[in-house]
Regions:
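Structural motif
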Residues: 6-10, 91, 120
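Long, compositionally biased
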Residues: 57-89, 142-179
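A short, structure-level motif marking secondary-structure boundaries and short turns
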Residues: 11-13, 24, 95-97, 108, ...
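N-terminal domain-start signal
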Residues: 2-53, 57-67, 169, 175-194
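Short, solvent-exposed interaction modules
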Residues: 82-109, 113-116
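Amphipathic alpha-helical packing elements
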Residues: 19-55, 102-140, 144
Length: 194
């Protein structure tokens, strides 16, 4: 029987395919859009469909993480407020909107899950949960870069993909001890307040 992929799987898949498209079309522009070094841009330019699918299906976390945290998000939103733009949205704006909406939805469902999935602090999860649709759209219309960056550079992604199928999530988690600490702190705060 066919099972539909999770929303996270679809978000990861579309995000990585979009990243690869930009790395193939114009590597120098992709390095600016996603804050990539040349080696990582080359990796994502050459990454295969099978490798993208392996990362998306085996890892239970977002493969693109937010550019802004709880300290930088308010300034980015303040810079976007009051600007009016009556034109068709660009590919970049739609990409940013799709990923910001997915993050906002995750934060509204469960801050603890959002902290783990997106590698963010509890304060950052709170900031994105409070973000309304109008401010999200305004932010997307003013950004000239991706609001989300690849979670892994070329070295980390290659190490994960070199692991046997079925064990990649374990190795990915082992590389990210800071995520585990943030997730445990979020879990404890949720447990203690409810």
């Amino acid at each position: 029987m066919f099972a539909a992929p999770s929303a996270l799987h679809v978000t990861n898949l579309t995000g990585l395919v979009w990243l690869r498209k930009h790395c193939r079309a114009c590597p120098s522009r992709a390095t600016k859009l996603f804050d990539l070094d040349d080696e990582t841009a080359l990796f994502y330019r050459k990454v295969s469909d099978a490798s993208i699918e392996a990362l998306c299906s085996e890892l239970d976390l977002s493969l693109l993480i937010p550019r802004f945290d709880s300290h930088t998000l308010p300034a980015a939103i303040a810079g976007a407020q009051g600007r009016r733009c009556d034109r068709r949205p660009t590919d970049l704006e739609l990409h940013n909107l799709r990923h910001l909406q997915a993050l906002r939805d995750a934060c509204q469902r469960s801050n603890g899950d959002a902290v783990w999935t997106y590698r963010i602090s509890q304060e950052t999860a709170d900031a994105y949960r409070e973000l309304d649709h109008d401010r999200t759209v305004a932010l997307c219309k003013t950004l000239s870069v991706s609001a989300f960056l690849p979670r892994y550079d070329a070295t980390a992604a290659s190490r994960i993909l070199d692991r046997p199928s079925g064990s990649r999530a374990l190795f990915a988690a082992a590389y990210e001890t800071d995520i585990v600490a943030a997730s445990e702190a979020a879990w404890r705060s949720t447990f203690l307040t409810h």
